[in-house]
């Protein structure tokens, strides 16, 4: 004969429920500072390591619900109505890098946005939501909502190289009420690259910058030939011409048939040493001989 499973029936007490609700209300009275909407709660590098995982819960919230009794934690919920994932790369837009992302509730195994792929060579913000509440006790036991993914890069990117920064931003609310919303499609907003401003706005600034390191002590303003002379110069061509005052010459008169000459001084050049012309084949620089 098969044995029927034994189960202990739940029994309720109105007084116990009233007392528990009062305890929950008192516990949540200090959550005003926590429920302040969106906050940038984290920042961590995107690395070429294959996978990453981050828990979407702040230390402040964990510390807050850690003070609750087990009964109170079982009646308190944590909501993440809005989740943003911002990314800014340090790699160039010509470097191949892709990430595949998803959200997962570890307590229930539910997943959202699985298969979402983004290029990690561009800056963007992803907008998501988790349309249901999380039990505070599950969050306290590290079984809350997690954002994770895998990263794959080009073979030229070294392993464990930091290729950018992740900035997860989410809303976090501790409440006695439960969130019940429809699931929205993931939305991506891509940033447009900015432009480099003008660094030098005039020739004067550029000239001053260049002159701070470039020498102009020996320089011509326009293009000049560095040497203007013959291709070959004799070292013995220069000499001083003398005058021989002992020689006279008679210049003939116009009507004199005999051709009488008047003697006068005559310029006589000094004997020159005949120069030897070198052939082009045998020529060499005398200054370096």
UniProtKB/Swiss-Prot annotation:
Pfam families registered for this protein in UniProt: Bromo_MP
Subcellular location: Host cell junction, Host plasmodesma
Keyword Transport applies: yes
Signal sequence residues: none
Superkingdom of origin organism: Viruses
Biological process per Gene Ontology, one example term: transport of virus in host, cell to cell
Record keywords: Host cell junction, Transport, Viral movement protein
Coiled coil ranges: none
Cellular-component GO terms for this entry: host cell plasmodesma
Main location: host cell
Protein family: Belongs to the ilarvirus movement protein family.
Function: Transports viral genome to neighboring plant cells directly through plasmosdesmata, without any budding. The movement protein allows efficient cell to cell propagation, by bypassing the host cell wall barrier. Acts by forming a tubular structure at the host plasmodesmata, enlarging it enough to allow free passage of virion capsids.
Protein name: Movement protein
Organism lineage string: Viruses, Riboviria, Orthornavirae, Kitrinoviricota, Alsuviricetes
């Amino acid at each position: 004969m098969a044995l029927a499973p034994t189960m202990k029936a739940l029994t309720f007490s109105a007084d116990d429920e009233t007392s528990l609700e009062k305890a929950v209300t008192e516990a949540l009275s200090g959550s005003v500072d926590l429920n302040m909407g969106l906050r940038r709660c984290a920042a961590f590098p995107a690395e070429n390591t294959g996978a990453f995982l981050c828990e979407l819960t702040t230390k402040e919230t964990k510390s807050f619900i850690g003070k609750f009794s087990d009964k109170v934690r079982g009646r308190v919920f944590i909501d993440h109505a809005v989740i943003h994932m911002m990314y800014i790369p340090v790699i160039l837009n010509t470097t191949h890098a892709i990430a595949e992302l998803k959200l997962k509730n570890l307590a229930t195994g539910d997943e959202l946005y699985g298969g979402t792929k983004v290029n990690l060579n561009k800056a963007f913000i992803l907008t998501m939501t988790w349309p249901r509440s999380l039990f505070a006790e599950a969050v306290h036991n590290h079984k809350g909502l997690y954002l994770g993914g895998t990263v794959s890069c080009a073979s030229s990117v070294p392993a464990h190289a930091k290729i950018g920064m992740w900035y997860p931003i989410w809303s976090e609310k501790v409440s006695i009420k439960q969130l019940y919303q429809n699931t929205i499609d993931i939305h991506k907003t891509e940033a447009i690259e900015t432009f480099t401003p003008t660094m030098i706005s005039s020739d004067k600034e550029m000239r001053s910058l260049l002159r701070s390191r470039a020498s102009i002590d020996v320089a011509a303003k326009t293009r000049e030939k560095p040497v203007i002379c013959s291709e070959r110069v004799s070292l013995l061509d220069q000499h001083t011409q003398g005058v021989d005052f002992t020689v006279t010459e008679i210049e003939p008169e116009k009507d004199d048939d005999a051709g009488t000459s008047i003697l006068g001084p005559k310029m006589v050049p000094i004997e020159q040493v005949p120069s030897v012309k070198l052939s082009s084949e045998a020529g060499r620089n005398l200054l370096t001989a």
